[in-house]
Amino acid sequence: MKKKVFTVAVSLLTILLLVACGNNKKSTDTSSSEIPKTSSSQKAEQSSKTIEFSTTAIDTVIYEGKGVTLTYKGLEKDDYEYTLKLAYKNTSNKEYEVQTRNGKVNNISNNDNHKIIICSDTLKASATSEGSIKLPINALEAASITKPKVLECNLEVIYDITETVAKIPIKVTFE
């Protein structure tokens, strides 16, 4: 008798625990003909054409949208690197990252053997800031590039690590 009471009590307790851990959300009708919207992480705003400019074209607006403006401010060169200076204006209430992807200099791709393009800047919410795209001279030399002539890459504006907000293809001619 005690065994049966114990088994029934454990069974009831198990059922109560399963009900308590169940999904509290209302179910959705999957037979609806409505097509779900694509999230912005899957569909970033992409410039339809490549933004082309030379290193002498100071104050070139590269991108303007989603509360963010990216502007090219000039080229600096020292013994260690070429630096393409950028200015950022973020009028949104979100913090973004700007990074380069699929980059190449003089048609030589950026890869693990030679990191010829470096860019990772943070844009604080409702702020202006400065950043840069750097081309380290030792990495350029390792890739057999004596002088950069053309930089091609995508500048990507990223929110919350995974959501690409904008993808801007650029082509910069060094003069």
Sequence positions of predicted segments:
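Asparagine-centered strand-capping/turn motif at beta-strand->loop junctions
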Residues: A87-N93
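Short acidic, flexible loop segments centered on an aromatic residue
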Residues: N93-N111
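Short, solvent-exposed, Trp/other aromatic-anchored flexible loops in extracytoplasmic proteins
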Residues: E81, N110-T164, T173-E175
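Bacterial N-terminal signal peptides that target proteins for export
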Residues: M1-A9
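N-terminal, intrinsically disordered, polar/charged segments of Gram-positive cell-envelope systems
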Residues: T7, N24-L70
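C-terminal motif of bacterial Sec signal peptides marking the signal peptidase cleavage site
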Residues: L17-A20
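Short, solvent-exposed loop/turn segments enriched in Ser/Thr/Gly
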Residues: D79-K85
